[in-house]
Amino acid sequence: GNVQSIIDRLNVDALEISSGAETISEDYLLITYTDGYGDVPSEVEEFLSGNNSHLKGVIVSGDQGYGEAYCKAGDVIAKQYNVPCLYKVENDGTEEDIDEIRKIIENQ
């Protein structure tokens, strides 16, 4: 999907959240997509319920065709876990988006 494409283009170490049962014990940035009409994907909700203490920020993918729900999962996570929503990207992003996201990651 779009998030996998972003990760592949960033060429960074990443933990793929497929079930939500994954664990992480170091600081991390979450890159996720927005599900449905502004929802946090269920496996991401489950992952965050047990792995939010090291969460430092969220980068979110969305589709502007959804209007006000565009990238809303990032806003929901930011509010729920009191972390910044660092970047919103349309689908899998442009090269400029990837460069900006890379800078954000390098500055964490």
PLM regions: where:
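N-terminal beta1-alpha1 ligand-phosphate binding loop
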Residues: 1-11
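FMN-binding flavodoxin-like domain, especially the glycine-rich phosphate-binding loop
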Residues: 9, 13, 17-18, 25-108
